[in-house]
């Protein structure tokens, strides 16, 4: 019996990690419908737009001996294929570009956090509200402007993944 326990311990230590679950977690990482608040500094309006974002669970691993072995990279739900759409905010003063672009998720994947497509800093307290305090009451518009320009592909920031420290 002691030999069996020793062999089992050796097997666990040699793996270095264990899966959080053998069954896929539900709901898995996938595009979902979402309503986002859109505003721009200098424009006196905050509107909401309907889009798709990546959300859901990704399988992760954890070390059995966390103090002895280095941390494993953790994956998060990221955009795989994305297109960018643009809208024109109404009522922006002269000299302020009224065009705002936002991502539309076409497909998603579990991967290291990519700053070009993912907010790696954690959840926002109120993702459906505007940051400007003037727009946090019920007077903000809840519908997109009637005329939306055609979608455009915009260059994104560098695609540098965040690695664990």
UniProtKB/Swiss-Prot annotation:
Heterodimer of a common alpha chain identical in LH, FSH, TSH and HCG and a unique beta chain distinct in each of the hormones. Residues 143-154 have a biased composition (Pro residues). Keywords: Disulfide bond, Glycoprotein, Hormone, Pharmaceutical, Secreted, Signal. Encoded by a cluster of genes that have evolved by duplication from LHB. HCG-beta is encoded by six non-allelic genes (CGB) clustered on chromosome 19q13.3 and named CGB1, CGB2, CGB3, CGB5, CGB7 and CGB8. Two specific hCGb proteins that differ by three amino acids in positions 2,4 and 117 have been described: type 1 (CGB7) and type 2 (CGB3, CGB5, CGB8). The CGB gene first arose in the common ancestor of the anthropoid primates. It is found in: Secreted. Glycans are attached at residues 33, 50, 141, 147, 152, 158. Changing residue 24 to M: Requires 2 nucleotide substitutions. SMART domains: GHB. Belongs to the glycoprotein hormones subunit beta family. Disulfide bonds join 29-77, 43-92, 46-130, 54-108, 58-110, 113-120. Its main location: secreted. PANTHER family: CHORIOGONADOTROPIN SUBUNIT BETA 3-RELATED, GLYCOPROTEIN HORMONE BETA CHAIN. Pfam families: Cys_knot. It comes from Homo sapiens. One of its GO terms (biological process) is apoptotic process. High expression in the placenta throughout pregnancy. SUPFAM superfamilies: Cystine-knot cytokines. One of its GO terms (cellular component) is cytoplasm. One of its GO terms (molecular function) is hormone activity. The gene is CGB3. Residues 1-20 form the signal peptide. CDD domains: GHB_like (cd00069). Residues 131-165 are annotated as: Disordered. This is Choriogonadotropin subunit beta 3. Beta subunit of the human chorionic gonadotropin (hCG). hCG is a complex glycoprotein composed of two glycosylated subunits alpha and beta which are non-covalently associated. The alpha subunit is identical to those in the pituitary gonadotropin hormones (LH, FSH and TSH). The beta subunits are distinct in each of the hormones and confer receptor and biological specificity. Has an essential role in pregnancy and maternal adaptation. Stimulates the ovaries to synthesize the steroids that are essential for the maintenance of pregnancy.
């Amino acid at each position: 019996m002691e030999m069996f326990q020793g062999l089992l311990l050796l097997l666990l230590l040699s793996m270095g990690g264990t899966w959080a679950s053998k069954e896929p977690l539900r709901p898995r990482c996938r595009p979902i419908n979402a309503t986002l608040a859109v505003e721009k500094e200098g424009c006196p309006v905050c509107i909401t737009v309907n889009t798709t974002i990546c959300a859901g669970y990704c399988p992760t691993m954890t070390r059995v001996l966390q103090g002895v072995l280095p941390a494993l990279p953790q994956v998060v739900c990221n955009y795989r294929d994305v297109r960018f759409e643009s809208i024109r905010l109404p009522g922006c003063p002269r000299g302020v570009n009224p065009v705002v672009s936002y991502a539309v998720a076409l497909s998603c994947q579990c991967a290291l956090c990519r700053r070009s497509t993912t907010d790696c800093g954690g959840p926002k307290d109120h993702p459906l509200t505007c940051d400007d305090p003037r727009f946090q009451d019920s007077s903000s518009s809840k519908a997109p402007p009637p005329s939306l320009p055609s979608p455009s592909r915009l260059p994104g920031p560098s695609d540098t993944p965040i690695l664990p420290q």
